[in-house]
């Protein structure tokens, strides 16, 4: 089988000698478990995104898990089993799995194929008396219209959560995506805006939730809690007693100290990474905004452009399979738009308590006719022009 050279990969490394030196510092210290570097990264992360608190975890998926879990453990629980959470029909699997794992009713709503985010008109009509939260997913770097979502929930006992794992650095009206909800999650996996090997973060302005996140991140013990906290009140002055005191059913989703050290360096570079992604996007939009048979994602606010969606129009002379073949033969990596329509995954949905709010026509459409190619923190002008020339033929 002929091996095709990759000319335009989905992602590329964001590291240089600064990250390698950070790793070496941790190796030299001989302290590999979560410590001062993680703590500093959390401080830097919260400051960068304008949030009071940040908790680093092992991945964006575990960030979602802790975000949902924490809402069951507040003094006045914000969730109970059976509560309804509205989600878009297009997202990554671990947006949904924590909802199932905690016995919540998942209510799927169609997306808008222009923005790839939840359809706002369908969201409004999807709300029921059981709805407790909207888990908004900012897809492929594109923030939701949170002004509209806030207006929809006005006067209702409904809070907003954000899965911002694909949209680090996106903004709406000058405010960072991930900070519009009660909590927001981020990913720093290799292919994302910054990379800490594996890694994720949860941010919040709520101190009680912050303390719960600290507790359930590491075994549900009190060891990492402040001396006075919202879970146990005043901790014992005896460190031996507090070292193995368990108060919540937690996990072990701690990050490595190495990941924290890398993250400190990566955050310094994030503004330039986002700037270059947006420069690439400007070229992409100029070339593809009037393409005869391809639609592109419509930007809301200031996208951080995780990747570039290519959605075939109904009048397209080629199928998606033919589009994929063209791209692969040209050495251009591509993949479906996240998972496509998640509702096609009947094998796993049999474990869910879920409802569907009407038709999911746009989710189905992008599932069959959409894909995306990568965007990077480096200049891709030649690759994007080449992509356009290939699809002009």
Swiss-Prot record:
Gene3D superfamilies: Aspartate Aminotransferase, domain 1, Type I PLP-dependent aspartate aminotransferase-like (Major domain)
Origin superkingdom: Bacteria
GO MF annotations, alphabetized: glutamate binding; hydro-lyase activity; protein homodimerization activity; pyridoxal phosphate binding; transaminase activity
Keywords (A to Z) from UniProt: Cell membrane, Lyase, Membrane, Pyridoxal phosphate, Transmembrane, Transmembrane helix
Record field: catalytic activity: GDP-4-dehydro-alpha-D-rhamnose + L-glutamate = GDP-4-dehydro-3,6-dideoxy-alpha-D-mannose + 2-oxoglutarate + NH4(+)
Cofactor: pyridoxal 5'-phosphate
Keyword Transmembrane: yes
UniProt subcellular location: Cell membrane
Amino acids binding GDP-4-dehydro-alpha-D-rhamnose: 30-33, 223, 333
Family: Belongs to the DegT/DnrJ/EryC1 family.
PANTHER family: DTDP-4-AMINO-4,6-DIDEOXYGALACTOSE TRANSAMINASE, TRANSAMINASE
Subunit structure: Homodimer.
Name by which UniProt lists this protein: GDP-4-keto-6-deoxy-D-mannose 3-dehydratase
Gene, per the UniProt record: colD
């Amino acid at each position: 089988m002929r091996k095709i050279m990759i000319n335009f990969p989905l992602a590329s490394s964001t590291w240089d000698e600064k990250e390698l030196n950070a790793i070496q510092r941790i190796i030299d210290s001989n302290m590999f478990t979560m410590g001062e570097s993680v703590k500093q990264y959390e401080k830097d992360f919260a400051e960068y995104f304008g949030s009071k608190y940040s908790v680093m975890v092992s991945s964006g998926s575990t960030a979602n898990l802790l975000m949902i879990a924490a809402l069951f453990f507040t003094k006045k629980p914000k969730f109970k089993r059976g509560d309804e959470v509205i989600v878009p029909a297009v997202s990554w699997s671990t947006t949904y799995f924590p909802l199932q794992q905690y016995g919540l009713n998942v209510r799927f709503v169609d997306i808008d194929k222009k923005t790839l985010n939840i359809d706002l008109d369908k969201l409004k009509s999807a709300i029921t008396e059981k709805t407790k939260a909207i888990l908004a997913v900012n897809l492929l770097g594109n923030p939701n219209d949170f002004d509209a979502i806030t207006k929809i929930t006005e006067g209702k006992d409904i809070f907003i959560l954000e899965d911002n794992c694909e949209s680090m650095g996106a903004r709406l009206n000058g405010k960072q995506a991930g900070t519009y909800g009660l909590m927001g999650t981020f990913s720093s996996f290799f292919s994302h805006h910054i990379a800490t090997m594996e890694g994720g973060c949860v941010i919040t302005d709520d101190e009680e939730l912050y303390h719960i996140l600290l507790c359930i991140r590491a075994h549900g013990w009190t060891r990492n809690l402040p001396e006075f906290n919202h879970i146990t009140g005043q901790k014992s002055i005896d460190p031996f007693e507090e070292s193995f005191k368990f108060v919540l059913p937690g996990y072990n989703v701690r990050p490595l100290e190495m990941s924290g050290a890398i993250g400190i360096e990566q955050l310094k570079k994030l503004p330039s990474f986002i700037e270059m992604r947006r420069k690439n996007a400007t070229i992409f939009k100029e070339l593809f905004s009037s393409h005869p048979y391809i639609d592109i994602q419509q930007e809301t606010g200031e996208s951080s452009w995780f990747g570039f969606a290519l959605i075939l129009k109904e009048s397209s002379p080629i199928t998606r399979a033919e589009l994929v073949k063209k791209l692969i033969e040209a050495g251009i990596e591509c993949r479906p738009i996240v998972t496509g329509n998640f509702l096609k995954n009947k094998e796993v949905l049999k474990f869910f308590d879920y409802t569907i709010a009407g038709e999911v026509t746009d989710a189905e459409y992008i599932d069959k006719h959409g894909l995306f190619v990568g965007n990077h923190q480096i200049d891709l002008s030649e690759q994007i022009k080449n992509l356009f020339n290939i699809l002009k033929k």
